[in-house]
Amino acid sequence: MLSNPQRTRFRKQHRGRMKGISYRGNHICFGRYALQALEPAWITSRQIEAGRRAMSRNVRRGGQIWVRIFPDKPVTVRPTETRMGSGKGFPEYWVAVVKPGKILYEMGGVPENIARKAISIASSKMPIRTQFIISG
């Protein structure tokens, strides 16, 4: 269940820069517990899905999980052993641009110890340092 946009206005994007902190999506909105990013990074759709699966496997029934990031940036890759020039590569995979402070996952309907365990497993799937936070 890898997520990527169904259609975009343009097939390719500039790489851009990840400077500053996240001013949007940095508060807990849906659940009671959350995983917050502490570093800037590109997080691929595969990494997001791996974290979601790890959490849902731990929570079982009763708990709810919300994924607060969406991979909407295409990353292009050139074929190997290709000479310089002749245009930009083809879109290979999708990433979510994450800045420090951004909430990655939220969880509710479970005790704190279970949530802490599930979120720590999901954080090990992420390529960045994260922290567990509680609303309120």
Swiss-Prot record:
Record-linked InterPro entries: Ribosomal_uL16, Ribosomal_uL16_bact-type, Ribosomal_uL16_CS, Ribosomal_uL16_dom, Ribosomal_uL16_sf
Pfam families assigned to the protein according to its UniProt record, in alphabetical order: Ribosomal_L16
Major location (coarse): plastid
Keywords annotated in UniProt: Chloroplast, Plastid, Ribonucleoprotein, Ribosomal protein
GO biological process: mitochondrial translation
Any one GO molecular-function label of the UniProt entry: structural constituent of ribosome
Family, similarity comment: Belongs to the universal ribosomal protein uL16 family.
HAMAP family: Ribosomal_uL16
PANTHER family per UniProt: 50S/60S RIBOSOMAL PROTEIN L16 (PTHR12220), LARGE RIBOSOMAL SUBUNIT PROTEIN UL16M (PTHR12220:SF13)
Quaternary data: Part of the 50S ribosomal subunit.
Name of this protein: Large ribosomal subunit protein uL16c
